[in-house]
Swiss-Prot record:
UniProt binding sites for Zn(2+): 279, 281, 284
SUPFAM superfamilies the record matches: Pre-PUA domain (SSF88802), tRNA-guanine transglycosylase (SSF51713)
Gene giving rise to this polypeptide: tgtA
Organism the protein comes from: Natronomonas pharaonis (strain ATCC 35678 / DSM 2160 / CIP 103997 / JCM 8858 / NBRC 14720 / NCIMB 2260 / Gabara)
Family as reported in the entry's similarity comment: Belongs to the archaeosine tRNA-ribosyltransferase family.
Binding locations of substrate: 128, 196
UniProt keyword terms in alphabetical order: Glycosyltransferase, Metal-binding, Transferase, tRNA processing, Zinc
Coiled coil (UniProt feature): none
Residue positions of the active site: 93
Entry protein name: tRNA-guanine(15) transglycosylase
Bias kind Basic and acidic residues: ranges: 489-499
Any GO CC annotation of this UniProt entry: cytoplasm
GO molecular function (one): zinc ion binding
Length: 520
């Protein structure tokens, strides 16, 4: 067991945790953002990152320092913390990005690890091989073997108290990501960055990014802190946190500012396209777009970088509050609606509902049904799985969206998207869900799946479904032999079908509207 990371709260696979960084003598609350600091271009001083934005940890490129005539000796003599005037934790990269960009670097794996140790890095990184998304499986597997060897070599380097990253590669092949993660987790290394995802984000391949993260998570233990290398845009933080990422590093705040780009949780705007600033951070409260445009290049870049950091740190606070309230997936859905590619990422996340369900709390606040995607959430899957553990009472059971009826030995409630459940569970999560009046077809289809699960588990029992006009696709998916009863008109629901007949010829109970037998 690794004792540097502790989970405090969670929702879906997202978590609020504490990462202990012994060399820095500090604990970092996660999810955390590591602003990237280029020693040659300090758009915002590290001291300001700490004092104004609350940054507890930052990242800089150890390879740039290693090759810098200006900074190498200063870093060795004074240490990173004095060099940057930063009291929090400092992570260093090894030059793997330069390797992926230029094909070679002028330092060995062991040399760069020792250099990172000697300059006082708190979390160092070996030289892994970032495989581009377009690489073949054979090339990806070969690169992965090299990365594995370098992680094993990193274990033999005396790094003192410095934590060491164990990058998880594997390209766009989730099984290779899982294999890489299992190997990395089996080492004595400490933090687990999911690497080579920047090209996926740059091309808006958020579905592939999520599959890479989920593959890596399958190979890691619950005590493994996960860093999404190169992820710095706030629009995807909630999605990545829900998939299980704890750390993010952002050069975007400065790089985008240099190009007059303005970050939001819904995407990126060019300053020239803005007539209003849709933000209340100190920069946006004190300036109009025209005033920002009137600044000289250096000051405008600095102001935009500050805004970009404010919105990024604010989003992480929003995510943490969503985790505490148990509505992280609802936040993810709202963020996903900002861009079609984010919808792809959200759908890829929900395809792994089985995986998410293992970490998702059994009880939280209200479940809000926001769209057809909500029908695929892990809470719905958990309810369907729970049906296998419930028993029915009697030979004839009614599953009803209305009330009960004397023809049946027992009546269970029926509620899309969850399906059937005994009345005793009516006040339990997630069956207290807030639902729109006009549900989409996927809610009914998910409920029908729950009915199928219950019917299949009780083959000797006769079941009937009393519904308020379910769509044909949901009804057609029910098992043969299930009696279908159409409920009648309801003054509170004028859009429902008004066909009526008494189900058994007896006077129905007061809370059960009359209906018709669709199987007659």
């Amino acid at each position: 067991m690794r004792d540097i990371f502790e989970r405090r709260d969670g929702d879906a696979a997202g978590r609020i945790g504490e990462l202990s960084v012994p060399r820095a003598g500090t604990t970092v609350e996660t999810p955390a953002l590591l602003p990237v600091v280029n020693p040659h271009i300090r758009t915002i001083a590290p001291a300001e990152l700490e004092s104004t934005f609350g940054a507890q940890i930052l990242i800089t490129n150890g390879y740039i320092l290693y090759g810098s005539d200006e900074y190498r000796e200063r870093a060795l003599a004074d240490g990173l913390h004095d060099l940057f005037d930063f009291s929090g934790a400092i992570m260093t990269d090894s030059g793997s990005f330069q390797l992926s960009e230029y094909g070679e670097i002028s330092v060995t794996n062991e040399e760069i690890l020792r250099f990172q140790r000697d300059i006082g890095s708190d979390i160092g990184t070996p030289v892994d091989i970032p495989t581009p998304p377009e690489a073949s499986r054979e090339q990806t597997a070969a690169d992965l073997e090299t990365t594995k060897a370098r992680l094993e070599a990193a274990e033999t380097v005396d790094t003192g108290e410095m934590l060491v990253n164990a990058p998880v590669q594997g390209g766009t092949y989730p099984d290779l990501r899982e294999e890489a993660a299992e190997h990395a987790y089996g080492t004595t290394l400490d933090v687990f960055p999911v690497g080579a995802v920047v090209p996926l984000m740059n091309s808006y391949r958020y579905g592939d990014m999520i599959e890479a993260i989920l593959g890596a998570k399958r190979g890691l233990g619950a005590d493994a802190p996960v860093h999404l290398f190169g992820a710095g845009h706030p629009m995807m933080f909630a999605l990545a946190v829900a998939a299980g990422c704890d750390l993010f590093d952002s050069a975007a705040y400065a790089l985008y500012a240099r190009d007059d780009r303005y970050l939001t949780v819904a995407g990126t705007d060019h300053l020239d396209d803005l007539e209003y600033l849709p933000c209340s951070c100190p920069v946006c409260a004190d300036h109009t777009p025209a005033e920002l445009q009137a600044e000289d290049d250096t000051e405008r870049e600095r102001l935009l970088a500050r805004h970009n950091l404010h919105v990024s740190f604010q989003e992480l606070r929003t995510i943490k509050q969503a985790i505490k309230k148990g509505n992280l997936l609802e936040l993810v859905e709202r963020r996903a609606r900002g861009h079609p590619a984010m919808v792809d990422g959200y759908r890829a996340l929900l395809e792994a509902a089985d995986q998410l369900e293992r970490d998702d709390p059994v009880s939280k606040g209200s479940f809000f049904y926001l769209s057809g995607e909500s029908a695929r959430r892990p809470e719905v899957k958990r309810h369907h799985d729970r049906l296998s553990r419930l028993s029915v009472d009697g030979d004839r059971v009614l599953l009803s969206e209305g009330g009960d009826n004397s023809r049946f030995d027992e009546t269970w409630r029926l509620q899309p998207p969850f399906g059937p459940f005994p009345p005793a569970l009516s006040d339990s999560y997630p069956l207290t869900a807030e639902l729109p009046e006009r549900l989409d077809d996927r809610a009914y289809e998910a409920a029908a799946k729950g009915v199928r699960r219950l019917v299949d588990d009780h083959p000797e029992t006769e079941f009937a479904v009393a519904h308020w006009g379910w769509p044909d696709a949901a009804l057609d998916s029910l098992p043969d032999g299930v009696e279908l009863l159409r409920l009648g008109a309801d003054s509170d629901h004028p859009e429902r079908d008004s066909a009526q007949s008494d189900m058994d010829g007896d006077e129905p109970k007061e809370d059960y509207p009359p209906g018709e037998d669709e199987n007659a």
